[in-house]
Amino acid sequence: AAQEPGSRPDELRHRRDRALILLGFWRGFRGDELIRVRVEHLRLVPGEGMTCFLPRSKGDRQAQGNTYKVPALSRLCPVTATWEWIDAAGLTEGPLFRGINRWGHVGEEALHPNSLIPLLRRLLTCAGLPDAEEYSSHSLRRGFAGWANANGWDVKALMEYVGWRDVHSAMRYIDGGDPFARQRIEASLPETPALPGPAAN
């Protein structure tokens, strides 16, 4: 039988997808990093956020792993969304982001890389974003980099937060949305002063 709106599968998918988008965006993760996050590698830090350990990453040549700090926010909080998903799915270990079948059963395996991009595009289409088919597994990272740049983060701070070691990698993400720096310059231009009115005789 078809599932009714508001059913457990719908609720689980909503919580998973919300956690995936918010964690991916606010942490600046690529798609392959998101699907490698494991429940046992998350640690809550009361009043601050949580830490997320990835045993390996693209720039980790020594294979020592990296620990990323995820902030707790007053709105659109990635920490709250992540733990609500963990609680709803009853996860204790293993991959954080998994498939959910039509009956609401949460799988044991991580989402496959080939299923992540269609999932992301479907979520963006539902959110009303245009050209959703152009988004890729790097889009959440690119979106965060653009947001941070527009809100005054300098390149060094952004590199430290995301984990870039090469400034050229950072600039590829930053310059993509505003290659001529028009938006940044326009935003900092002073308002045109009002013309003085006619002088009284």
Report the location of each language-model feature.
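Conserved catalytic core of the tyrosine transesterase superfamily
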Residues: 1-139, 147-201
